[in-house]
């Protein structure tokens, strides 16, 4: 480990928070790192040289106070990524809580606005699905997307905080007082297009 000088770190806004309940508000890929924030601001802090220099990218995710903002970030490749979150205090609210990027996080577009299950604490691309299939979990249940995050179907009311895929057909989930293994036998992805 090597400490980075404070004068090289990005400036944080007062009351900007970094929610880590799912351990997925940071994504690394090679020399690159994306760190997602919430609270007063929902932004992406980005470095492409191991933290020597930083850029800050704004997002359209709900923000402004307390438990609002980005809770999880994932990337399929260096350009294609997704953030999820919302308002932990009002988990059924489903506006401005999912956004995708096609340019490495510089710009973000809201998706499934008003058409998703609400607050999510973790999102993951499903391996070997060419960036098309994702799962998101939270206190509002488990949701699945087969179109890169543009639309979502709630597939379970089970509450989890985090999900991590082992391979295309299996994942570990954790929640309050529980750890589970998910085995995907077959997803009928045409059934909710």
Regions found by a protein language model. Give the residues of each.
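Asp-box/BNR beta-propeller loop motif
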Residues: 1-12, 45-63, 88, 92-115, ...
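Solenoidal tandem-repeat scaffolds enriched in leucines and small polar residues
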Residues: 1-45
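Short glycine-/Asp-/Thr-/Trp-enriched loop segments that recur within the blades
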Residues: 11-20, 63-68, 116-120
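Conserved positions at the start
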Residues: 21-23, 68-70, 78, 120, ...
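Entry beta-strands of beta-propeller and related beta-repeat scaffolds
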Residues: 32-34, 79-83, 130-135, 170-172
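Recurrent small/Gly-Pro-centered beta-turn motifs in extracellular repeat architectures
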Residues: 36-39, 84-87, 137-138, 175-176
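Loop/turn-rich, solvent-exposed surfaces of beta-rich toroidal or solenoidal domains
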Residues: 86, 112-143
């Amino acid at each position: 480990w090597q400490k980075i000088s404070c004068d090289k770190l990005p400036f944080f806004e007062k009351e900007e928070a970094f929610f880590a309940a799912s351990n997925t508000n940071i994504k690394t890929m090679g020399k690159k790192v994306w760190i997602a924030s919430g609270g007063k601001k929902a932004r992406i802090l980005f470095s492409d040289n191991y933290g020597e220099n930083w850029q800050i990218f704004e997002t359209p995710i709900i923000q402004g106070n307390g438990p609002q903002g980005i809770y999880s970030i994932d990337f399929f490749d260096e350009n294609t990524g997704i953030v999820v979150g919302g308002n932990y205090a009002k988990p059924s609210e489903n506006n401005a809580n999912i956004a995708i990027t096609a340019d490495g996080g510089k710009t973000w577009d809201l998706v499934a606005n008003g058409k998703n299950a609400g607050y999510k604490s973790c999102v993951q691309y499903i391996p070997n699905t060419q960036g098309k299939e994702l799962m998101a979990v939270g206190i509002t249940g488990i949701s699945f997307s087969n179109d890169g995050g543009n639309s979502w179907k709630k597939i379970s009311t089970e509450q989890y905080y985090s999900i991590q895929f082992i391979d295309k057909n299996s994942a570990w989930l954790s929640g309050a007082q529980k750890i589970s293994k998910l085995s995907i036998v077959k997803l009928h992805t045409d059934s909710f297009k």
